[in-house]
Amino acid sequence: MTVDYKNTLNLPETGFPMRGDLAKREPNMLKSWYEKDLYQKIRQASKGKKSFILHDGPPYANGTIHIGHAVNKILKDIIVKSKTALGYDSPYIPGWDCHGLPIELKVEGLVGKPNQNISAAQFREACRQYAAEQVEGQKKDFIRLGVLGDWDNPYLTMNYHTEANIIRAFGKAVENGHLYKGSKPVHWCLDCASSLAEAEVEYEDKVSPSIYVRFSAVDSDAVLAKFNATDKGTGNISAVIWTTTPWTIPSNRAIAIHENLDYQLVQFNDERVILAKDLVEEVAKAAGVEQVVILGESKGKDLEWLRFQHPFYDFSVPFILGDHVTTDGGTGLVHTAPDHGHDDYIIAQKNGIEMAGLIGNDGLFKADVPFFAGKGVFESNDLVVAKLQEVGAMLKFSKIKHSYPHCWRHKTPIIFRATPQWFIGMEKQGLRQQALSEIKKVRWIPDWGQARIEKMVENRPDWCISRQRTWGVPVALFIHKETEELHPRTVELVEEVAKRVEQKGIQAWWDLDTAELLGADADNYIKVPDTLDVWFDSGSTYYSVVKDRPEFNGQEADMYLEGSDQHRGWFMSSLMLSTATDNKAPYKQVLTHGFTVDGQGRKMSKSIGNIVTPQEVMDKFGGDILRLWVASTDYTGEISVSDEILKRAADAYRRIRNTARFLLANLNGFDPKRDLVKPEEMMVLDRWAVDCAYQAQNEIKDAYDNYQFHAVIQRLMKFCSIEMGSFYLDIIKDRQYTTKADSLARRSCQTALWHIAEALVRWIAPVLSFTADEIWQYIPGERGEFVFTEEFYNGLFALDANEQMNDAYWQQVITLRNEVNRVLEQARNDKIIGAALEAELTIYANDTYAPLLAKLQNELRFVLLTSKAEVKPLADADVAEGEVKGFAVKVVRSANHKCPRCWHYSDSKDAESLCSRCDENVNGQGEVRQFA
């Protein structure tokens, strides 16, 4: 009769499910986290610890979140959770950017334009309501990602208190002397009818006219004298410029040349032209000129103030010197329209040349402009070309495809246009140099970020902070009606406005009666009607939020983390404002991540059909798979996502979950209070396993601390798959299942598993937050309610320095065991054995390996998972060495009976009898293990 020995075994048992079923389980966990006020419990547990402040860059409150948003928020959450585990107080206050044009456009579609279909005050209220709805929608999606934060009290740039603080930051910049009003060229969107910030400009390919234009010399003799032309040549003399914006020719007021460049007067067929020496050949080829004769040469500095007739207006323009002129293309003579180019404006100002002011806010030529009155700028391209051809000023016309600035919102070409605006001056009070100095004090991750933002700061123009919009924080200034000078009490008045905005929001500014603040002065001053650039809103959050929120205790932000496009966006605006108000950078570290692309490296696009949404991923795989994908990726470059890539993340997840389940199942019946074994009493292999976890934890903590999350996952997978899965957990099954339930051999093993589980759950919590919370509920022993309030486990220990069977020892054993497994696999293929336990091994080892294996005595077979293993000198070998030199393995099939309980082949009397080891474990005192 066959006896069932199942009840005599310590079989693994746990309520922790094998399948994650994340898409179904995670929402219930979120509900529990919210009901139990998890975020505030983390705050309480962290009170008094050193702080780490990651300041959330506000996403725009418009539309649903995309995969890039998910990457960004998950990276932030991993950092905040890992910093908490590393012993920091790391509050997370999510925020939203709520003012600005995109919301205005949406609301216009719903209620009409302000001051046409609806009052401006009603329009602002509609914008506020719309933004609030968008925030709620995005908030739900961010929470679903498993991101922990103060979601009940986020910062919104439209909160009255925040709006007031934005005005206060503005007032501080004014007080420190960084503000001025000027008419200078800014990016102008014809569709927005407003100026744009640098960060609101995108570059796309556009086909434009490419024209070479003649400006005839006013005094030909003066030109010939400057060029020392002995051969004077024949025909009209003209300076030739090149441009792709014919519509700016009416605004031309000068031609720029470089003082150190060589210029030549050359005969082109029957006319004479002035060109940079290095570009003569190129221009001749472009214009189809075959006969070229050099008539004279001169340095640019000697040609200054020569005058040339405007092609179709009755005035002349001078040659002026400019450092921006190069010979990279064109003619080396630069068409200069001060209204429509940054360099043009700077050089015109320097030379006392006034702007033309021909284009209105609507993008049309003003009514008094000859030839082009009432025409739009882009339609005027053809008209200007026709006019140039009519007057004989066109040397060459063609078309060119080139990169051209477009509005980020409308995707339409924009123009440079001079308008009266308010600016933060880069050279005022040494702002540019101070900002460059502050950049060097910041840690940039990856480090190329430093050079990138330095170059941007070096080259950026003054910051146009005013907008002609309705939904935005006001430029809260009073200016004199006649002189346009600021009121002498401006700083004080800005604070008075801020106090009112704090009570009633930005509408308080437009409702404000000037006399209320200015008294008798009210008749002489007007309120500025403009709003602040939304980049001022978000750029001032170091002031309006970080300095203000009590959770931050007046500390500055340790980290800003956004996509790499924010070097010219939020990182830039924050740096400029903080330097202007506080003379320092607002952050200590700046981390940037790349953009998401598909598996083939292509941008996400509706037309390609390769868009992956976070909502779809979570519905299919669950939030933890999305989080694991983010953590596994080197975020410093492009971040690839596809179904295949997510499936790989799901496979890795299963390995981690299976490891956790094995640990939990084998902790069945273990009470750490009662059963924990002291380190010195544990089996050597168990001590080594804890040491493995100890070493892994040090590396994982270091990787978290340095934001190397892919290194965290790699180390975690190595630990689960190799150190534990294919070695330790494999070996301990026999001891765990077959020894006496309360034996030292089993409790030692469970002690190791318990320590490892306590460590592992904390390692994965910043990334696999839902799964960690689930594991936490199943680990035996008293514990806090949530893993997220805990620091990394401090109960691990390293092997004693005097331990002979140290890590180096076990690494050698693993190498030899891998060789044994190779030989066993061959024996299986050769049908010598089926399962490994059918094998009896004779190992022939040299003087290095023999003593090493001998240390394990009769427990070597348990390490090798065979029924018998004996070691003999290599000289006795009757089989060849394998892949490890000095080591040979002979496999024979055991002739013994298989024990019905432990399945080892040994000294059982018959197939139904227990082996002596199992008999001792079932009926006696229990076997004694020393090593494994």
Curated annotation (Swiss-Prot):
It comes from the Bacteria. InterPro entries: aa-tRNA-synth_I_CS, aa-tRNA-synth_Ia, Anticodon_Ile_BEm, Ile-tRNA-ligase, Ile-tRNA-ligase_type1, Ile-tRNA_ligase, M/V/L/I-tRNA-synth_anticd-bd, Rossmann-like_a/b/a_fold. Belongs to the class-I aminoacyl-tRNA synthetase family. IleS type 1 subfamily. A motif ('KMSKS' region) lies at residues 603-607. It is found in: Cytoplasm. Binds 1 zinc ion per subunit. One of its GO terms (molecular function) is aminoacyl-tRNA deacylase activity. A motif ('HIGH' region) lies at residues 59-69. ATP binds at residue 606. Its cofactor is Zn(2+). The lineage of its organism: Bacteria, Pseudomonadati, Pseudomonadota, Gammaproteobacteria, Pasteurellales. Gene3D superfamilies: 1.10.730.20, HUPs, Valyl/Leucyl/Isoleucyl-tRNA synthetase, editing domain. L-isoleucyl-5'-AMP binds at residue 562. It is an enzyme of class 6 (ligase). IleRS has two distinct active sites: one for aminoacylation and one for editing. The misactivated valine is translocated from the active site to the editing site, which sterically excludes the correctly activated isoleucine. The single editing site contains two valyl binding pockets, one specific for each substrate (Val-AMP or Val-tRNA(Ile)). Transmembrane segments: none annotated. It catalyses: tRNA(Ile) + L-isoleucine + ATP = L-isoleucyl-tRNA(Ile) + AMP + diphosphate. This is Isoleucine--tRNA ligase. Monomer. Its EC number is 6.1.1.5. GO terms for cellular component: cytosol. Zn(2+) binds at residues 899, 902, 915, 918. NCBIfam families: ileS. Its main location: cytoplasm. Catalyzes the attachment of isoleucine to tRNA(Ile). As IleRS can inadvertently accommodate and process structurally similar amino acids such as valine, to avoid such errors it has two additional distinct tRNA(Ile)-dependent editing activities. One activity is designated as 'pretransfer' editing and involves the hydrolysis of activated Val-AMP. The other activity is designated 'posttransfer' editing and involves deacylation of mischarged Val-tRNA(Ile). GO terms for biological process: isoleucyl-tRNA aminoacylation.
